[in-house]
Amino acid sequence: MGKLITAILLLLSFSANAQMNFCTNDLDSYPTRSGGRIKPLYVLATDTIKFITGESKVDDLSATEAFCKLSLKAFGMPLELPVMVRVDHVDVKKILGIKDSEHSIAVNEALTKMSILDTELAKTKENNSYKKEITKVKQRLEAYTAIVEARLWTVPIAKENDIEFISLGEFLTETRIAVVREKSDNPVNFLFAEAKDQFLKVKGDGYLLELRYFKMNLFMWAMMATLIAIAFLVAMKNKWPGAIFTAITIGLQLTAITMRVMISGRGPVTNMYETVMFSGAGALVIACIITLFRKEVAFVIAGLCFNILSLLMMKFANGMLDAGISPLVPVLRDNFWLSTHVTTIILSYAALALSWVVANALMIRDRFSKVSSAEYRYGVDLVYTCMKFGVVLLAAGIILGGVWADYSWGRFWGWDPKETWSLIVLLVYMAILHGKSTTWIPP
């Protein structure tokens, strides 16, 4: 009965004009809590809509507008949006009755087939790609249900000089709306504005850094600067224009990484997205450092090439990489060791990736054009220079990892798979470098 009265009050509160003025992109900056931290509504809406549909929009609506309108369905608002649920696995498409050429199913149709997904999930014992896709589709449907039941969107309320977050369903109650109707013709807008003001007084607007981080899209600008830098360094004898755009690229990426660190409060190396991000920028910085000593622009070009590959992965490999900022798993909740051991290891990946780029460029050049023996030996020397940096960083990272293990678990080395294989990799690279410095590997 209470929900019915609330729905009626909401319908009265939302004239056609007011409804249009509420669910707008002005809500992008609204504070909400999800995944254990405070973030702008824009981030929650974009991540959730993209997770459900694979797109950042629903029809012509932005993620924030669609998220808002879907959330108001819980209160009887007459809103119908063509939400499509992403389905990628061909066998999951079959059980849901989707053509192989299609990549999504209408959410209302998918909800009627939830029992089919549950049955298939129970039948499938092996944790293969089929089972993972069923689980993911179920999670998408559960996320949609949480939105339309007004459970996912949380709203701040002041409580004893602090802020708590409650679900939208708990926030828009009959009592609150009835009280505020005496103060404003648009009680819902008034309630939300009042809650935001109270939040800003207590917590401030530091959470808006995340909104600026995503809106500025610095990695896209860095991608463009990287392409221009490569073109200038390859095509022009005067290397200064390329050097300037290389510096711009580094500046953009370091700014973006710094913002991400400030938002998360930890080192930017906790998942695959951040590994790709940090290794790409790290490779370019290491390439510039090596160039200062060797005076060879090929290192910078190699760093830019690996960097553009990393940026392309970050932009387009959405199925593999998640750009979201998530809380740390318990084993990584030590910011000092995370910022030393893990960053050192990833910088070693970056240096070794430079050797990979230089070596492949040398082989391709040798395959399609004549490379003199002197040029070939010089190219090989560039490869080994990158490897030396990588091996030093890898060794340092492994030692730091052992110290962290001793600090956390009371033992320096336990021969678990990660420790064993990291040592194998280090020994292989050390054998190659040793062979090059002796007579094992000919010049």
Describe each PLM feature range:
Residues 300-307, 373-396, 443:
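Interfacial and helix-entry/exit segments of alpha-helical transmembrane bundles
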